[in-house]
A protein has these predicted regions:
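Conserved small/polar residues in nucleotide/adenosyl-binding loops
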Residues: 268-274
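Helix-loop-helix "hairpin" substructures at the membrane interface of multi-pass membrane proteins
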Residues: 153-233, 259-261
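Short loop segments and helix-boundary regions at transmembrane helix junctions
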Residues: 14-23, 79-125, 178-190, 238-256
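Membrane-interfacial amphipathic/re-entrant helices at transmembrane-helix boundaries
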Residues: 1-6, 20, 34, 43-69, ...
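Hydrophobic alpha-helical segments embedded in the membrane of multi-pass proteins
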Residues: 4-9, 26-30, 221, 234-253
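Alpha-helical transmembrane segments within multi-pass membrane transporters and channels
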Residues: 46-107, 114, 261-266
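Transmembrane helix-bundle core of multi-pass membrane transporters
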Residues: 52, 56-57, 91-92, 100-181, ...
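Residue-level signature of the transmembrane alpha-helical core
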Residues: 30, 71-75, 106, 165, ...
Length: 278
């Protein structure tokens, strides 16, 4: 279900602008790097500053509470969305989708480079208190399903994936309610249907894009937390965008609930051969 979290960000931006945001995976990486940086008190651009000025500063403080670090990371991702709109998107309104797609490819490389300069390229451990590992009670409960003398030792499901499923469902329900029952949500749907018609009735395209990219940045942060908790925060994390492509193909590029369905099918396909521990 962690693939669904990445796919949600793709769907939101594609619905609002018709653009496949190639940088969504890098968003998740950047959010995870920033969160670890806040948690550990790391000085941004420490390596660059120390090289230029001959200093040896690496940390502002010893640690930061997880809740505060997550809040600051969320603010950072929303600010990043605003900067992207101001510097990139506002100059590309009404351009061909291929131009916008190429812009997101360039954006991915730029963000990846900035993340490297800010926080370094070493693998980092991310821990926000989310439990992980196999569910022992499920294994014990399913041992009895096998016949006596068999080599079946119970069903294995990672607790982290259970948490990811719950969070993804909550996000989908929240986004569905937001888009259906709020004025801003209806404006977002209008922009998704027809940019020119939305502009003609006074809807600010730039405001909607900032909102969508901000929400997408928040979702990327959630995905980055989940993936970083599972496999560590490393630059290969940006490749999860490619792993989310089957989810988008199965669920649809404009369907928010489809991201959950596609993620469920993809996760089942990937884990079914190893779901039983023997």
């Amino acid at each position: 279900m962690m693939y669904s979290l990445v796919a949600l960000g793709f769907v939101l931006i594609f619905k609002a602008s018709g653009v496949f945001n190639f940088a969504q995976g890098v968003f998740a990486l950047f959010a995870a790097l920033t969160l670890v940086g806040y948690q550990t008190g790391q000085v941004p651009f420490a390596h660059l500053i120390n090289e230029l000025f001959g200093t040896n500063y690496h940390h502002w403080y010893a640690s930061m509470p997880n809740f505060l670090a997550i809040i600051l990371t969320m603010i950072t991702m929303i600010a990043l969305a605003w900067i992207i709109e101001r510097l990139v998107l506002k100059h590309l309104v009404n351009q061909d989708p291929i131009i916008l797609f190429m812009a997101t490819i360039g954006l991915a490389f730029v963000l990846e480079g900035i993340g490297d300069l800010m926080w370094g390229s070493d693998v980092k451990v991310l821990d926000v208190g989310i439990p992980s590992g196999g569910s022992e009670w499920l294994e014990q409960a399913t041992i009895g399903l096998a016949s006596e003398g068999s080599d079946y030792y119970g069903m294995y499901i990672d607790v982290l994936n259970v948490w990811a499923t719950v969070i993804a469902v909550i996000l989908v329900i929240s986004l569905a309610i937001f888009s259906q029952y709020t004025k801003t949500g209806r404006a977002l749907r209008a922009v998704a249907d027809d940019h020119q018609a939305a502009l003609s009735v006074g809807i600010s395209l730039r405001s909607i894009w900032v909102l969508v990219w901000g929400i997408s940045g928040f979702i990327a942060m959630v995905a980055g937390i989940m993936w970083g908790t599972e496999s560590g925060v490393q630059f290969s994390l940006s490749l999860i965008a490619l792993k989310a492509l089957p989810v988008l193909i199965l669920g649809g590029f404009t369907s928010i609930p489809g991201a959950i369905i596609g993620g469920s099918v993809s996760y089942t396909h990937l884990t079914l051969p190893t779901i039983y521990s023997v």
